[in-house]
Amino acid sequence: MGKIEAKNIEKFFQHDGKPLKALGGVNLTVSDGEFVCIVGPSGCGKSTFLRILAGLEKPDGGEIMLDGKKLADTGPERIMVFQEGALFPWLTVRDNVEYGLKIAGIPEKERKEISNRYLDMLSLIHI
């Protein structure tokens, strides 16, 4: 993927008519191949920060860079796994597994091979 950088990320919300700082000058650099966990108590801004990294929310200050290029919107190079269930209820189990692959332009035959491997691994192949 490459190196992703968050530089001086700020985010404010309104609370009782006053600005409430959710994120204040957050900086993070994650190089290709690194594995990072963001931990903290409920309400400290973890999800807000991840939503900004994924392009689902805009910061009130700062910028997100991918390989030195400023990111402005969502894109296929970024994803987010949500805390709550995020299945599409109108799709089958297989179609849910293949959804991201389809969006990424993976051919149908290859999608089936990939989904078969993981559905079998989880004993869900017959669902």
Cite the ranges covered by each PLM segment:
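A short, flexible loop at the N-terminus of ABC-type nucleotide-binding domains that lies
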Residues: M1-A6, F12-G25
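Short beta-strand immediately N-terminal to the Walker A/P-loop
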Residues: V36-C37, M80
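The feature captures the beta-strand-to-loop junction immediately N-terminal to the Walker
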Residues: V39-P41
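Conserved small/polar residues in nucleotide/adenosyl-binding loops
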Residues: C44, I125-I127
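Helix-to-loop junction immediately C-terminal to a conserved catalytic motif
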Residues: A54
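Conserved ABC transporter NBD signature motif
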Residues: G62-T74
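Short coil-to-helix segment of the ABC ATPase nucleotide-binding domain corresponding to the Q-loop/switch region
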Residues: L91-E98
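Conserved ABC ATPase "signature" region
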Residues: K102-I125
